[in-house]
Amino acid sequence: MSKKYKHTKELNDKQSPSTGSCTAFYGKSGWEGFKKPYMFFEVADCSSKVRLHNSRLDKRDVFIKKMKRLRNELDRFIVFLDDV
């Protein structure tokens, strides 16, 4: 596997005392026997974290569909909040 991607973005302003970040990853898994590329998108805040990742059964296109659904729902929620 030659391609690798890892990027973390802080979500709060620099002067904020709160923590929050999102991380996107594509690369080799550290799990034994996991031969396919490992992909995840993780969102974290002060006390919690959630990771959407591919399973051994997911193909790359299935994972991409999940990510697009997540993005679309987040966009809808932002539009709603802007109008409240």
Label each residue range with its predicted role.
Residues 1-84:
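Positively charged, low-complexity terminal tracts
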